[in-house]
Each structure stands twice: as structure tokens, then as C-alpha cells.
Amino acid sequence: YDPENRNTRKTIYDYFRDMEEGDANFNNIEIPVNEDQNSFKISLIPGHPKLSIIDDTMSKSWSETLSGDKGAIRKLNWLNQLKKENTTFDYILIDVGPSLGALNRSALLNSDYFLTPMASDIFSLLGISNIGDWIERWMNLYEAAIKTFVSKFGEEESRKFFEKYSINTDVNKTTRYIGYSIQQYSKRKF
């Protein structure tokens, strides 16, 4: 594995690295682990610890999207580009870290549904409320950005651009909370 060789992409970070360098294109994605290569019969793009570096790029994209920047809005909609390129999958599951950072926001705003893990404690209950407030705020900001984009470029040009790059124009059809899973602790004897 050579991280500088774009032909040996093995993790999701390898795709985001192009974005960090200014390219918002998620076309021609090869899945490193295909369903016929494992007993679980799933395809997988592994994560990478360096993916957190992309959060700065995404944070900048959030700000620039509010002013109608075309490249920025494409970056925020990376997940839709990924979905468009991989139409053979029934589901795409994304496991994000426990953060309200810009990368996770972009994943949540472009996911059809999401669920959260919880422990049986007060902090989990407070966290769910916090996530709900943040998501509502993000959705409002994103909707305002779409309106700014349309007023800046006009309805027809915006429609073509949104279609071409799979831009989410209605966050009310995405980002739906479907529930939680409870994590239970088990005691082990050693």
C-alpha cells in the first residue's frame, strides 16, 4: 500500500485526500473490499484515523456554502456522489465518530436515516437532545444556503448544477432519526 499512489486506494481517507487538495469529485470509486472477498458478503471502504483532518476542509466548505460557492456545496454532498456512483447497493452504512464536526454533519445531512448508540445513563439522554438541536440548526443553515445559491445563479442553472452533482436540495427528505441501540455492559471474570 502506497498512500501517495492514487491507484492503490484502500481507505475512505484516500478518496477524501483528493477533496482536501481541492477536487470535490467522488466519481470512479473502487470499493477496496468487495462482497465476494469475505464471508459476511458485504462491500467495505475502511475508515482511517487521518479522516479527522478532513474536518477542517469540511468546516471551511460549510462557511463557503452559505455564500453560494459551487465547489463547497459539492464537497458537502460527497455522500450523494458516492451513492450515485454505487447504485448496486441496497444500503450504505456509515459509522461516524462521536462528534458534531463538519464531516459528520455532511454525512448526516445527506443520509436518509440515522440511529445513535446509547448507554443507559443521563449523558446519553442529554446527548440525543443536543444532537436534535444541532441537526435542526444545520438543516436550517443548509436550506438557507440552497436559497442563496439559487438566488445567486438562477433557478435553471441551479437545477442543472444540483442534478449534475447530486446536491441535496431538500433536507426534510433526508436526515431522519430512526432510533437508537442500547449498549449494555457485561462484567467479565478473569
Regions found by a protein language model. Give the residues of each.
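P-loop NTP-binding core
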Residues: 1-190
